[in-house]
Design a protein with these regions (language model features):
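Bacterial N-terminal signal peptides that target proteins for export
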Residues: 2-13
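M16/MPP (pitrilysin/insulinase) zinc-metallopeptidase core fold and M16-derived inactive scaffolds
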Residues: 30, 55-120, 183, 295-310
Length: 450
C-alpha cells in the first residue's frame, strides 16, 4: 500500500507539473543543454513542482536484431532494469519502488527508448540507477528466463489474435527479405535462442552516443542537467557497431492475399508506400490522411460505417519508418461484405487521387491537426518523450511553436498534387484474414472482382 501511495503521489505531481508547464496557446520554452563532454539534451525547466522526467532515444531497435535472434532488442528492453551493478533483480526493483522512481525501457522497430520519472528529492538515486542499468546490467539467468517466458506467452497470444496476425502477414508480404517484415517481439523459436551474452553484445553495440536524443522536463536546472548527462551517458560507446539497416521500398503491387481462418469476420489490412518524414510534402500527406480516415467525419468512416454499416471502425495512417515510408490501414467486416469493403477503400483512394480534397475538408483537417497537437502532452513524461522524439527527427527546438505554420502553408493546389502522389490505388495491397466470400483463399488477384 505504501508503494502504491507513493506511485500515486508521483503521478499526480507529474500531471500537475505538466499543467503549469505547457498548455494550448502557450509557447514552449525549450533550452538546448550541452554537457562538458558534448552530450545534448532539450530541457523544459519548471520548478513549480518537485518532479523530473527524462526520456532518451538510441538508434537501435528490432530492425537491428540478428536474423536468427529476432526479439533480441525487445528482450533487452525488458531485462535492462532487472538488476544492475551490485543490485539483484529483486533489490533493483525494490529500490525503485521505495523511492517512487519509474524506470523502464521500450524497443521499437527503429528506436530504443529509456524513460525515468522521479521526485526531485530522489533524483540522484534515479539517475544513478539509470546509469547502472545502461552500463552494468546483470542479465541474471533467472530474471532473463522469467521475462522470456512472459514474452513467449505474449507471442502465443498474439498468434491467436486475428488483427495482430493480419498485420504481421501484411508486413511479411511487403517486406519479405527485410527486417521490417519480421515480428518485433520475435518468434517462439528465436526468443528461445537468445542468451545473456546476446543481450550484452546488443547493449554494447547499440546503446551508444551516436544518434542519442534526450528530452527532460521539470525541476532541474540546465547546469545540473549538464552534469547528469555526463554522469549517465558520457561513458557509453561513441559509435554504434550494429550492422546498418538498408532502405527498402515496400513491395506493394496492388494484389489481394487471402489467408484462411475460420472466424466470423474478415480482418483487412491494406496499404502501400507512403511519404517519408522530412519530405516537404509530409504534412500535406498528414492532412490528406486526416480527411480520408482521421475521424468519424472522414471519408472512409462515412462510407464504410455510417452509410453502409460494414464495419465498426476503419482507419489508415502514415507510417514513416526510418528505412521505408508506408501508408497502412485496417478494418474488419463480415465475411460476406469483405469484397464490398475492399472496393469502397479502392474507390475512396481513387477519388482522392483524381479530385483531391474539398475546401471545407482542408479547413477542418488543418484545424484538427493544429488543435490536437497540445493534447498529446498529457503529463511530464509525455512532454519529455516528445522533446526526445523531435530532436531525433532532426527538428529544431522551435518546432512546437512553428508547427502550425508548417501545416497552414499547404494550399488546395498543393494538396491536389500530393494526393496524386500519395493515393496509389493501383498499388493498394491487401491482406485479408478470414473466409471472405467471392475472394478465394490464397487469392492474389489484382482486383476483388477478379
Amino acid at each position: 500500500m505504501l508503494i502504491a501511495c507513493r506511485t500515486t503521489i508521483l503521478r499526480t505531481a507529474l500531471v500537475v507539473g505538466l499543467l503549469l508547464t505547457a498548455w494550448p496557446g502557450h509557447a514552449f520554452d525549450i533550452q538546448k543543454v550541452t554537457s562538458p563532454s558534448g552530450i545534448t539534451a532539450w530541457l523544459i525547466e519548471d520548478h513549480s513542482n518537485p518532479v523530473i522526467a527524462m526520456e532518451m532515444i538510441f538508434d537501435a531497435g528490432a530492425a537491428n536484431d540478428p536474423t536468427d535472434k529476432e526479439g533480441l532488442a525487445n528482450l533487452l528492453a525488458s531485462t535492462l532494469d532487472e538488476g544492475a551493478g551490485e543490485l539483484s533483480s529483486t533489490d533493483f526493483q525494490s529500490a525503485l519502488s521505495e523511492k517512487s522512481i519509474s524506470l523502464y525501457f521500450r524497443a521499437g522497430t527503429d528506436r530504443f527508448r529509456g524513460i525515468v520519472s522521479t521526485l526531485t528529492a530522489n533524483s540522484d538515486t534515479a539517475f544513478e540507477m539509470l546509469r547502472l542499468a545502461l552500463h552494468q546490467p546483470r542479465f541474471e539467468a533467472a530474471a532473463v528466463d522469467r521475462i522470456r517466458a512472459q514474452i513467449m506467452a505474449k507471442i502465443r497470444s498474439d498468434t491467436q489474435q486475428p488483427q495482430s496476425r493480419a498485420w504481421r502477414l501484411w508486413l511479411q508480404e511487403l517486406f519479405p527479405s527485410h527486417p521490417y517484415g519480421r515480428p518485433r517481439d520475435g518468434t517462439l523459436e528465436s526468443v528461445a535462442r537468445i542468451d545473456s551474452d546476446d543481450l550484452r553484445r546488443f547493449a554494447k553495440a547499440g546503446l551508444s552516443r551516436q544518434g542519442l536524443s534526450i528530452g527532460v522536463v521539470g525541476d532541474i536546472s540546465a547546469e545540473r542537467l549538464a552534469r547528469v548527462l555526463d554522469q549517465v551517458f558520457a561513458d557509453l560507446p561513441a559509435q554504434s557497431s550494429l550492422p546498418p539497416v538498408a532502405d527498402q521500398q515496400p513491395i506493394s503491387d496492388g494484389q489481394i492475399r487471402v489467408i484462411d481462418q475460420d472466424i466470423p469476420q474478415s480482418v483487412i489490412v491494406f496499404g502501400h508506400a507512403g511519404i517519408a518524414w522530412g519530405d516537404p510534402d509530409y504534412f500535406g500527406a498528414a492532412l490528406l490522411m486526416q480527411i480520408v480516415s482521421g475521424g468519424f467525419q472522414s471519408r472512409l468512416v462515412q462510407e464504410v460505417r455510417v452509410k453502409r454499416g460494414l464495419a465498426y471502425g476503419i482507419s489508415a495512417s502514415l507510417f514513416p519508418r526510418d528505412h521505408s515510408a508506408m501508408v497502412i490501414g485496417s478494418t474488419a467486416t463480415r465475411n460476406a461484405k469483405a469484397r464490398e469493403t475492399v472496393e469502397i477503400i479502392r474507390a475512396q483512394w481513387r477519388k482522392m487521387a483524381e479530385q483531391g480534397p474539398t475546401a471545407s475538408e482542408i479547413t477542418d483537417a488543418k484545424s484538427y491537426l493544429i488543435g490536437a497537437f497540445p493534447l498529446r502532452f498529457t503529463d511530464s513524461p509525455a512532454i519529455a518523450r516528445s522533446l526526445a522524439g523531435f530532436q531525433h527527427l532532426g527538428l529544431g527546438p522551435d518546432y512546437p511553436n512553428q508547427r502550425a505554420a508548417m501545416i497552414n502553408r499547404f494550399t488546395a493546389d498543393d494538396l491536389k498534387r500530393i494526393a496524386r502522389r500519395l493515393f496509389q490505388e493501383e498499388n493498394l495491397t491487401f491482406t485479408i484474414l478470414g473466409r471472405p466470400q467471392d475472394i478465394p483463399t490464397g487469392s492474389r488477384a489484382k482486383s476483388a472482382t477478379q
